[in-house]
Amino acid sequence: MAAAAVVEFQRAQSLISTDRNASIDIFHSIVRRDVQEDDEEAVRVKEQSILELGSLLAKTGQAAELGGLLKFVRPFLISISKAKAARLVRSLLDLFLDMEAATGQEVELCLECIEWAKAEKRTFLRQALEARLISLYFDTKRYQEALQLESQLLQELKKMDDKALLVEVQLLESKTYHALSNLPKARAALTSARTTANAIYCPPKLQAALDMQSGIIHAAEEKDWKTAYSYFFEAFEGYDSIDSPRAVTALKYMLLCKIMLSLPEEVQALISGKLGLRYAGRQTDALKCIAQASKNRSLADFEKALTEYTKELRDDPIINTHLAKLYDNLLEQNLIRVIEPFSRVQITHIAGLIKLSKNDVERKLSQMILDKKFHGILDQGEDVLIIFEEPPVDKTYEAALETIQNMSKVVDSLYNKAKKLT
């Protein structure tokens, strides 16, 4: 029995690269077969077949079948050790969730697995699955549910010795707070995660995720694009080493850093480099177009890129946030350059020069006047912008402050001398 299963398993493996469907059918037949608990070889072959079948179903995009496999193998999991069962469940669930197939059953399937782990009294597996559920809540923007589960799970994990899972949950906490724009708490959670990670060996995937979040926090909170770039580069190398689809996201953020550092010419060099060529596609093309628009200071090209690559740019909250600021800066620079030669100019003329709608231009000019980016007024009756000369800086206030500071020093000196005499 076991010998026949081994032969079938080897045949299925040999067909993976040439005939995936035939390989899947053979693995299916091995997985469906009942095995005796005391037949170690047959149990081992069935374990490996489950993992191989799960991997093939994920690669061929068969999300529903993979979800079904996860439910089907539960009776078999009771007959093997808790550690092996936990590894199988986590591996299959990770494969299912990493597919990002958006079947709508992800949360439901994860909750089912958690209930099964509770019923079987498998605490470590339940905690690992709850961490995966937090990640799902985060991906589906259910942030309050994520924070609630994070709080409960962190209390448990701090009393136990599973440091790797603790790092994972602390990292998820940082991501959740960042998504809620609570940067101080996001930074604190990330610091806790990195401190915990320093005491253990971090798998490449987890280390890359830590580096990615560090780059995001540096970019969001401190606008420290050089440091953010170095973190994104580390994350990119980490994800690339394990062939993770997240590598292209890290590469996108690297390109974003170059654009925000006013180095758009370096974007092409990164994309055409040895590592960049491997990930060439719409994701990198989108940032390439933004870099070109930034280099040419062209708002029209910028708008065109945002329209053409909506999914790649607008749907990524990190990219979208920073590109909105970049667009705003670019618009201000263009407006200041256009109005510089004038003391009085029609708003429609400005809109025509920078190829934007009159309402958008009028709104931005109003904001710039309020922010004191230049001195002027909008005459809406005449539909013109009137620009004033830069008023001379009144130095009376600065001179008064300097005088008061000098007088304070004199008084302090006299006080010290009088104190010595007494």
Curated annotation (Swiss-Prot):
Location in or out of the cell: Nucleus; Cytoplasm, Cytosol
Pfam families on file: PCI, RPN6_C_helix, RPN6_N
InterPro entries in the cross-refs: 26S_Proteasome/COP9_Components, PCI_dom, Rpn6_C_helix, Rpn6_N, TPR-like_helical_dom_sf, WH_DNA-bd_sf
GO biological process: proteasome assembly; stem cell differentiation; ubiquitin-dependent protein catabolic process
GO annotations of cellular component type: cytosol; nucleus; proteasome accessory complex; proteasome regulatory particle, lid subcomplex
Keyword Acyltransferase appears in the UniProt entry: no
GO function term, MF aspect, one: structural molecule activity
PCI domain boundaries: 228-392
Keyword annotations from UniProtKB, A to Z: Cytoplasm, Nucleus, Proteasome
SMART domains, A to Z: PAM, PINT
Record family assignment: Belongs to the proteasome subunit S9 family.
Record note on quaternary structure: Component of the lid subcomplex of the 19S proteasome regulatory particle complex (also named PA700 complex). The 26S proteasome consists of a 20S proteasome core and two 19S regulatory subunits.
Matches recorded under PANTHER family: 26S PROTEASOME NON-ATPASE REGULATORY SUBUNIT 11/COP9 SIGNALOSOME COMPLEX SUBUNIT 2
Protein's job: Component of the lid subcomplex of the 26S proteasome, a multiprotein complex involved in the ATP-dependent degradation of ubiquitinated proteins. In the complex, psmd11b is required for proteasome assembly.
Protein name as annotated: 26S proteasome non-ATPase regulatory subunit 11B
Gene: psmd11b
